Regions:
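Small-residue-enriched, tightly packed secondary-structure blocks
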Residues: 1-231
Length: 231
């Protein structure tokens, strides 16, 4: 059975990791993609990971397509510039930052840049009809309404969350960071004792999990309700 893990060498170079579960793509002649997840960053390769920021992935691609696909997508950012651009609001993959298919499983059989020169590497666990993933032209943006709901502060910014200046998040955030630290061999950001979980009306369902090695235990983050787009 082929190795399905993201290479440790790549994870050790990551300045940011976005986890976007159950990205849905329904296509017939035109393919549209949408999903919500989280992004954590670090200042250096030996620094602890920041608290997670909620993000949204959107995009579309022309082509003769038919079928429906749901994928769990992981984006590995290999430069500080890429995560700094994300803090500004959004980036377009392939335009604002170079993106390449990550070397794992079927994704490693073609189009793989083993020198890790791209700014972002994309991974997908796919259960539908499409054999692969192309993210060029997709937009990943900060989900302002979800961050407000999760952190309980109106207008909380990505910069505040990344720098530890936002309110203490629910306990699920710390468990996510513990799994992320295990996957990338770093320490977890020291933070105050987590506050009580947010009411179910604000965070009803699991939304994201860290990208551990195959078969590792995961801890989902609670998903805030998403309001109108504020990009």
């Amino acid at each position: 059975m082929p190795d399905q893990r993201i290479p440790d060498t790549l994870l050790s170079r990551a300045y940011g990791i976005a986890v976007i579960p159950d990205v849905t793509k329904v296509a017939f002649m035109f393919g549209g993609r949408h999903g919500n997840g989280v992004l954590a960053v670090r200042d250096s390769l030996s620094s602890p990971w920041s608290n997670p920021v909620f993000v949204a992935l959107t995009g579309g691609s022309w082509g003769i397509q038919a079928g429906a696909q749901s994928s769990d997508i992981i984006l590995v950012f290999t430069t500080k510039g890429g995560v700094e651009d994300m803090a500004g609001g959004k980036i377009t993959l392939g335009a604002d930052a170079s993106v390449a298919t990550g070397p794992v499983g079927r994704q490693g059989s073609a189009g793989t840049d083993m020198s890790f020169n791209s700014e972002i590497y994309s991974y997908a666990r796919t259960r539908g009809l499409f054999g692969g993933i192309a993210l060029d032209g997709s937009v990943i943006a900060i989900d302002k309404s979800a961050n407000t709901a999760f952190y309980g502060k109106q207008g909380v910014t990505a910069t505040e969350i990344f720098s530890g200046q936002a309110p203490t998040p629910p306990a699920t955030a710390q468990r996510f960071l513990e799994q992320l630290a295990m996957a990338t061999r770093t320490s977890v950001r020291a933070s105050p004792a987590p506050q009580a979980e947010m009411p179910a009306s604000a965070a009803p369902n699991p939304a994201a999990a860290a990208p551990p090695a195959e078969g590792a235990r995961t801890y989902p983050l609670e998903e805030p309700q998403h309001g109108p787009s504020q990009n």
